Curated annotation (Swiss-Prot):
<feature type="binding site">
    <location>
        <position position="124"/>
    </location>
    <ligand>
        <name>Fe cation</name>
    </ligand>
</feature>
<keyword id="KW-0673">Quorum sensing</keyword>
<dbReference type="GO" id="GO:0005506">
    <property type="term" value="F:iron ion binding"/>
</dbReference>
<keyword id="KW-0456">Lyase</keyword>
<dbReference type="GO" id="GO:0043768">
    <property type="term" value="F:S-ribosylhomocysteine lyase activity"/>
</dbReference>
<keyword id="KW-0479">Metal-binding</keyword>
<comment type="similarity">
    <text>Belongs to the LuxS family.</text>
</comment>
<comment type="function">
    <text>Involved in the synthesis of autoinducer 2 (AI-2) which is secreted by bacteria and is used to communicate both the cell density and the metabolic potential of the environment. The regulation of gene expression in response to changes in cell density is called quorum sensing. Catalyzes the transformation of S-ribosylhomocysteine (RHC) to homocysteine (HC) and 4,5-dihydroxy-2,3-pentadione (DPD).</text>
</comment>
<dbReference type="InterPro" id="IPR003815">
    <property type="entry name" value="S-ribosylhomocysteinase"/>
</dbReference>
<feature type="binding site">
    <location>
        <position position="57"/>
    </location>
    <ligand>
        <name>Fe cation</name>
    </ligand>
</feature>
<feature type="binding site">
    <location>
        <position position="53"/>
    </location>
    <ligand>
        <name>Fe cation</name>
    </ligand>
</feature>
<comment type="subunit">
    <text>Homodimer.</text>
</comment>
<protein>
    <recommendedName>
        <fullName>S-ribosylhomocysteine lyase</fullName>
        <ecNumber>4.4.1.21</ecNumber>
    </recommendedName>
</protein>
<dbReference type="Pfam" id="PF02664">
    <property type="entry name" value="LuxS"/>
</dbReference>
<keyword id="KW-0408">Iron</keyword>
<dbReference type="GO" id="GO:0009372">
    <property type="term" value="P:quorum sensing"/>
</dbReference>
<keyword id="KW-0071">Autoinducer synthesis</keyword>
Length: 157
């Protein structure tokens, strides 16, 4: 079986950052998959499930309600390894093109004070598994990277 692209990245050299994971074209439409890497794989502790779940709910809601990006957002969700998120967007983008959007997103999560979107029994399959305080903590740690982003945080090793 052919190895998928994400398994060809050397995770021993991967830093937190923003990376273009892949670009796909379907019927002349380009989709860019962004690797929002919050943790250094196999070095830092993974994001606890309740925090990653909360970031997913708030992040997806904020992105789909962003006036500039709403029509371009296809998907926002956690990686199975719990070291970050994937963002799939319509269009041909590079990592640097997403710095402002992703910085805005995680700043909004740090300052989020409303009820967690979609966190009721009717709206979520695991509605009790949320932790807003830890979501804010993980987001604030990631913002430290974003606020001082370097080339090594924008290009896969």
């Amino acid at each position: 079986m052919k190895k998928i692209t994400s398994f060809t990245i050397d995770h021993t050299k991967l830093n937190p950052g923003i990376y273009v994971s892949r670009k796909d074209t379907f019927e002349n439409v380009i989709f860019t998959t962004i690797d929002i890497r919050i943790k250094a794989p196999n070095i830092e502790p993974i994001i606890e499930n309740a925090a990653i779940h909360t970031i997913e709910h708030i992040g997806a809601t904020l992105l789909r309600n962003n006036e500039v990006w709403t029509e371009k957002i296809v998907y926002f969700g956690p990686m199975g390894c719990r070291t970050g998120f994937y963002l799939i967007i319509f269009g041909n983008y590079e990592s640097k093109d997403l710095i402002d959007l992703i910085s805005w997103l995680f700043s909004e999560i740090v300052n989020f004070s409303e009820p967690i979107p979609g966190a009721s029994h009717k709206e979520c399959g695991n509605y009790k598994d949320h932790n807003l305080d830890m979501a804010k903590y993980e987001s604030s740690k990631y913002l430290q990277i974003l606020n001082n982003i370097k080339e090594e945080n924008l290009k896969y090793p």
